[in-house]
UniProtKB/Swiss-Prot annotation:
One Pfam family it belongs to: gerPA
Protein name: Probable spore germination protein GerPA
GO biological process, one term: sporulation resulting in formation of a cellular spore
Gene designation: gerPA
Source species taxonomy: Bacteria, Bacillati, Bacillota, Bacilli, Bacillales
Function per UniProt: Required for the formation of functionally normal spores. Could be involved in the establishment of normal spore coat structure and/or permeability, which allows the access of germinants to their receptor.
InterPro entries named in the record: Spore_germination_GerPA
Length: 73
């Protein structure tokens, strides 16, 4: 469905970032990364109080491929 898009400004895009404006049928990644982080790892703010006394992150992942990118060129 067509849309009218007003003015916009892009300050920064990462190396694997995607910016799409308008109609699109598929957006396919060109790279993949697997990130493991425990409780409170990605908190942001001015004054945080994180109370995670005993924490364990389960990193067991039994599948071989999470996001296939073989044919995404």
């Amino acid at each position: 469905m067509p849309a009218i898009v007003g003015a916009f400004k892009i300050n920064a895009i990462g190396t694997s970032g995607v910016v799409h404006i308008g109609d699109c049928i598929t957006i396919s990644p060109q790279a993949q990364v697997r990130t493991f982080a425990g409780a409170g790892s990605f908190n942001t703010g001015d004054s945080l109080k994180v109370m995670n006394y005993q924490n364990a992150t389960n990193v067991y992942d039994n599948d071989a491929v999470d996001q296939p990118i073989v044919a995404n060129a």
